[in-house]
Every structure is written in C-alpha cells, then in structure tokens.
C-alpha cells in the first residue's frame, strides 16, 4: 500500500470482504498492527471512525481495514479527518458499486485512490476449476494471434467443457460454497436493491417494490431498448423516475446500459442488458436465450478495459468506437464482412 487512503468498490458478492481478510492474513498474519473492522458492528453505532482510528494508531496500529464503510453516517468526512490527523495510518475501505466515491464525496476527491473489484472472468474461473495458471491477454493480442493462443490453451484443457457452467454460475465467487447458488444469488440481488440502492441513494422503503418490479421487467424483456413510457405505467411512476431507477440498477451492477456511439446517460439507452449471464439464469431461468447470453457475456467481458457501444445494423457491438463485433451462436449464418470481427460460439480455433 503506497497511499494512505484506498477505496475498494465492487458489486455485492464479488468478494470485497474476503479480499480485505486475505490481505490482512497474507501481509500481516498475527501482527496486530493491521486490523479489520466492519461497520455493521453495533459498536460503531455509538463511536466514530475517527475516535476508533485514534485509539488504534495510539496502540501501534498501522493499517486499518474498514468493511462496508457506507453503513456509518458521515463516513466520508470521518475518513477525511483520519487522513488529515493520522498521516502514518493507512486505511483501506470497501464500499458498494452504487457509491459515486469521488463525485459525491468532495472531501475525498483528491486524496483517495479507488479500485473496482469485479467478479471472475472466464479465465479466472477456468484457472480455479482446472488448477491451471493461464495468463490474461489483451484484446489486441487475441485479435492478432488468437489461433496460437487457442492452440496453447487446448493443449492443456478444453475451455468449452467449462464455459456453460461459467455462464450459469461462475461470475460470483460464492459458487465455491457448497450451497444452492441460485438461491444465494437471489438473496444477493435483493440485498443490492434493498441495501445498496435504497440506503446509499436514500430512497424510501415504500418504493422498493417498484425498483424490483422494474428490474424484473427489464430482465424478462431481454436485451433491447427500454420502453420508458410503458415501464412508467407498469410500475406507476414518472418517466424521469424510471430513468433514475435504471441508472441506480446499472450502478449496482445489475444491468448494463448500452448506448450508440457519442451518447450517454441521461439519454435513453439503445439496449439494456443484464450485467452478467449468471443474473439471467437466476432472475428468469425459463426464458434464457442463448444469443442473449452470449452477447451479455461479451459485453460484460469487454466492459472491464474497453468502451462498448451498440453496433449498427448486423453488428452486435462497437468496441472502443472503432472495432465492430458480431456475436454468433452455433449454426448462425455469417455474411463474411472483412471489416467485422466475428465472435463464434463453440469454435475452438
């Protein structure tokens, strides 16, 4: 840790708490100069972060790991005070992806380094399941050398044997737990709406059912442009409120908003997709279209390091505004266009 204030954001369920605990174990072991605290603890209902940090560093504390920091009132002001008063104390805190860390907390804008923790990529999932250590490749490397890369991987494992399992349950780390994954994910999704969105955006509880209903309608409709007027009528609220709710769901990493090149929120997106394919199987498993799943996987994978826009006719996505991609399920007829890159399902090389 080179900075004294670091924020770890990420959607609920991707392993932020585990990340902090692993860091403490690997870097400090039983050394008590590093301490993990959770703002869910009732102790912090009657004590401030600043007072706790003062006492901790007075007793030799050097690194304070704070989980779910947004559960504490005035957390951003208190972190600023800690930063100013205890220059030798390093603080790492976790928060929800719904938090607009720098935009909505001006006192932290210039002093906090923010990172986003994502769910597992297919490569990470494959490594976990097979014990391999495949390295990551940039998009440029894959486009220029995909045959050699694929041959190297296929000499060790057959990725297609694991791909459908990843699409169904491989994005969130809790698939490793020996519990019902879908039930666990549904609970996590409910927590995203009930805690992350309502608490952080300070929305009254009576509107919870409207947000849940909106998420359900968006999921069932599949990837397409939302009919905002119809959705407003369905959940009995205004068009402006529907658009705000859609933005909150996107911030919570429950959906992705895909725009044409040059457009962004608050304009209506040209396509709304679930954030990852695991969500599709949990929220409405009886209506999961393979082409929709493949496009959701591609968009989610690209979003980490690239800009993703809706493509023109016969193009699924435009990546980084210059690379057109067409996502093709098995058996789909392809009109070979040399200017388009085709992502083919079940084509090993």
Residue ranges, per PLM feature:
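Conserved catalytic cores of phosphodiester-cleaving nucleases, focusing on short active-site segments
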Residues: 298, 302, 315-333
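Hydrophobic anchor at the beta1->P-loop junction of P-loop NTPases
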Residues: 5-8
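Short glycine-rich substrate-engagement loop in P-loop NTPases that contacts/grips substrate
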Residues: 31-63
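Accessory nucleic acid-recognition modules appended to NTPase machines
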Residues: 174-313
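Conserved lysine of the Walker
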Residues: 16-17
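Structural recognition of the conserved hydrophobic beta-strand(s) that form the central parallel beta-sheet
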Residues: 65, 90-96, 116
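Interdomain motor-coupling "hinge/lid" segment immediately C-terminal to the ATP-binding subdomain
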Residues: 96, 102-209, 215
């Amino acid at each position: 840790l080179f900075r004294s204030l670091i924020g770890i954001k990420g959607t609920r369920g991707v392993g932020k708490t585990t990340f902090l605990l692993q860091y403490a174990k690997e870097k400090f072991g039983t050394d008590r100069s590093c301490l993990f605290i959770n703002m869910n603890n009732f102790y912090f209902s009657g004590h401030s972060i600043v007072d706790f940090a003062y006492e901790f560093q007075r007793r030799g504390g050097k690194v304070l790991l704070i989980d779910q920091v947004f559960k504490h009132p005035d957390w951003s002001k208190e972190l600023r005070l800690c930063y100013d008063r205890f220059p030798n104390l390093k603080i790492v805190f976790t928060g929800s992806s719904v938090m607009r860390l720098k935009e909505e907390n001006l006192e932290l804008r210039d002093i906090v380094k923010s990172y986003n923790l994502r769910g597992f990529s297919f490569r990470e999932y494959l490594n976990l399941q097979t014990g391999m250590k495949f390295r990551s490749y940039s998009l440029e490397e894959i486009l220029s050398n995909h045959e050699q890369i694929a041959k190297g991987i296929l000499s060790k494992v057959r990725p297609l044997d694991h791909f459908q399992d990843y699409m169904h349950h491989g994005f969130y780390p809790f698939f490793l737990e020996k519990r019902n994954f879908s039930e666990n994910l549904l609970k996590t999704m409910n927590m995203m709406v009930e805690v992350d969105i309502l608490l952080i955006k300070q929305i009254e509880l009576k509107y919870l059912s409207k947000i849940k209903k909106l998420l359900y309608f968006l999921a069932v409709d599949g990837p397409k442009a939302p009919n905002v007027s119809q959705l407003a009528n369905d959940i009995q609220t205004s068009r402006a409120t529907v658009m705000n709710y859609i933005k909150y769901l996107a911030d919570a990493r429950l959906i992705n908003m895909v725009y044409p090149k040059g457009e962004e929120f608050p304009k209506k997106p040209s396509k709304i997709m679930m954030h990852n394919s695991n969500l599709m199987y949990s929220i409405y498993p009886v209506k999961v279209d393979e082409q929709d799943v493949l496009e959701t996987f591609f968009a989610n994978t690209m979003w980490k390091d690239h800009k993703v826009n809706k493509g023109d006719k016969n193009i699924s996505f435009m990546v980084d505004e210059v690379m057109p991609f067409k996502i093709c399920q098995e058996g789909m007829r392809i009109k070979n266009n040399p200017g388009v890159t085709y992502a083919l399902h079940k084509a090993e090389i």
